[in-house]
Curated annotation (Swiss-Prot):
Keyword list, A-Z: ATP-binding, Glutamine amidotransferase, GMP biosynthesis, Ligase, Nucleotide-binding, Purine biosynthesis
NCBIfam families registered for this protein in UniProt: guaA_Cterm, guaA_Nterm, PRK00074.1
Active-site residues, as the UniProt record annotates them: C85, H177, E179
Domain Glutamine amidotransferase type-1: 8-203
Disulfide bonds, paired cysteine numbers: none
A cellular component term, taken from the record's GO annotations: cytosol
HAMAP family recorded: GMP_synthase
Source organism of this protein record: Xanthomonas euvesicatoria pv. vesicatoria (strain 85-10)
Name the UniProt record assigns to this protein: GMP synthase [glutamine-hydrolyzing]
Binding residue positions for ATP: S231, G232, G233, V234, D235, S236, S237
Length: 521
């Protein structure tokens, strides 16, 4: 079997918003990589066995006291090193060059002039011209003097060093962001570093990952039984399909129907996994328990905790009935692992705690099986398609863990959840009919707990308000509201008001992120 982890790249993260994008681009090339904090234990960096190291961008200034630096072991390793943005600046500063703060930040599109050919830039062209490349900049500081042994390979009208290299040492740096699609030749630059300079084979493919994970799961669990909390979401669905392929009927899935799922989602999950794929699925109808626990609770964080804790409680009850189960499978994915890792210095902040990472009751003496923990979401989707799951399921828009519980503002009631699920289904149905679903990154309805005056027949009526939300985004860190056609919005509004008793008004959310978040709670 192919060892897909032999050739790998290590990315040291200095806190840039684009770091995960670097990793995703390298994975797309077909090479495995991991993201570690810049201050990770140097001995572990040496022991990782990378074929090359990338230094990411970051928000700090190399001119500030205590600015993050790459461990000296990186430069002593003899490995190729590629610094991006802040990564190039610290590369220069640490190796005897100089950096300085610019009078003003450079952010957005720029053109760089290639002035010397090296392994990355040789023969590279795009429509900006033979020696001019369209790139994406996002920086304040810049390199003012390259270190000894380095050559300037690219410049711009505003900065003297847009790229530099020391070919003898195989050290490279660029001030711009090759991982961003606006840098037209960015993927080619990354491929040249990873494949040509570092010598990595492109073994990281969906088929190879499935083969690798099946072997790992079989080795890990042996003849033991495994249980999985199946939510209907992409991650747990792909885990179910993968484990079923690996261990067959030794897998039992527990599907907790909270009453806060998408319209008819419970029936769809059972049809797909239990009936179509032959997976053992226990369905727990727990809506009554959820609505009882959520009664009178309006604080969003309190709702999240109640929903999460009750899921664990119910799952615990069901797992106790499965005496032979020794392993718990989870849909943890790589961003969960990164965000929960943090940094020993506190320079990299723990963004949030994840229900998939460290959220299990301590008395649950089950081993963990996490076959997706090395994968980004786009890779999980590709695996799902490779495993035979329907594209409509695998490429569905994101759905929050607490479900409709955080799309109902304020207190959650059964009648609100039923209205919202139906309104949401109408919105999604119309998006698909108009061929707009795949053109939006996320679209959903929100229940507003306010009554607005309307006219029903000849009478005034005070009824509920539904908000529609649709956004376009690449990474979900920033998002634009989707400019859906007025006629389309009118059709959706008419259907919701006409088909749902109790709704008299539909509004459309035109807030971007930032300042708004994508979800309302």
């Amino acid at each position: 079997m192919t060892n897909i982890h032999t050739d790998k790249i290590l990315i040291l993260d200095f806190g840039a918003q684009y770091t995960q994008l670097i990793a995703r681009r390298i994975r797309e090339i077909g090479v495995y990589c991991e993201i570690w904090a810049w201050d990770h234990d140097p001995s572990e960096i040496a022991g990782f066995g990378a074929k090359g190291i990338i230094l990411s961008g970051g928000p700090e200034s190399t001119t500030s006291p205590g600015a993050p630096v790459a461990p000296q072991e990186v430069f002593d390793s003899g490995l190729p090193v590629f610094g991006i943005c802040y990564g190039m600046q610290t590369l220069a500063a640490q190796l005897g060059g100089a950096t300085e703060a610019a009078d003003q930040r450079e952010f957005g599109h720029a053109e760089v002039d290639v002035v010397a050919a090296d392994a990355l830039f040789s023969g590279l062209t795009d429509h900006a011209g033979a020696s001019r490349l369209n790139v994406w900049m996002s920086h304040g500081d810049h390199v003012s003097q390259v270190p000894p042994g380095f050559t300037i390979t690219a410049t711009t009208d505003r900065i003297p060093v847009a790229a530099m290299s020391n070919e003898a040492k195989r050290w490279y740096g660029v001030q711009f962001h090759p991982e961003v699609t606006h840098t037209l030749q960015g993927q080619t630059l990354l491929r040249r570093f990873v494949v040509d300079v570092c010598g990595c084979q492109t073994l990281w493919t969906a088929a190879n990952i499935i083969e690798d994970q099946i072997a790992r799961v079989r080795e890990q669990v042996g003849d033991d039984e495994v249980i999985l909390g199946l939510s209907g979401g992409v991650d747990s669905s792909v885990v179910a399909a993968l484990l079923h392929k690996a261990i067959g009927d030794k897998l039992t899935c527990v599907f907790v129907d909270t009453g806060l799922l998408r319209w008819q989602e419970g029936d769809q999950v059972m049809a797909m996994f239990a009936e179509h794929m032959g997976v053992k699925v226990i369905r727990v109808n727990a809506a009554d328990r959820y609505f009882a626990k959520l009664e009178g609770v309006s604080d969003p964080e309190a709702k999240r905790k109640i929903i999460g804790n009750l899921f664990v409680e119910i799952f615990d009850e069901e797992s106790n009935k499965l005496a032979n189960a020794k392993w718990l499978a989870q849909g943890t994915i790589y961003p969960d692992v990164i965000e929960s890792a943090g940094s020993k210095t506190g320079k990299a902040h723990v963004i949030k705690s994840h229900h998939n990472v460290g959220g299990l009751p301590e008395h649950m003496k089950l081993g963990l099986v996490e076959p997706l923990r090395e994968l980004f979401k786009d890779e999980v989707r590709r695996l799902g398609v490779e495993l035979g799951l329907p594209r409509t399921m695998v490429y569905r828009h994101p759905f929050p863990g607490p479900g409709l519980g955080v799309r109902i503002l304020g207190e959650v009631k059964r009648e609100y959840a039923e209205l919202l699920a139906k309104a949401d289904a109408i919105f999604i149905d119309e998006l698909r009919k108009a061929d707009l679903y795949d053109k939006t990154s996320q679209a959903f309805a929100v229940f507003l707990p306010v009554k607005s005056v309307g006219v029903v027949g000849d009478a005034r009526a005070y009824e509920w308000v539904i908000a529609l939300r649709a956004v376009e985004t690449i990474d979900f860190m920033t998002a634009h509201w989707a400019h859906l056609p007025y006629d389309f919005l009118g059709t959706v509004s008419n259907r919701i008001i006409n088909e749902l008793r109790g709704v008299s008004r539909v509004v459309y959310d035109i807030s971007g992120k930032p300042p708004a978040t994508i979800e309302w709670e």
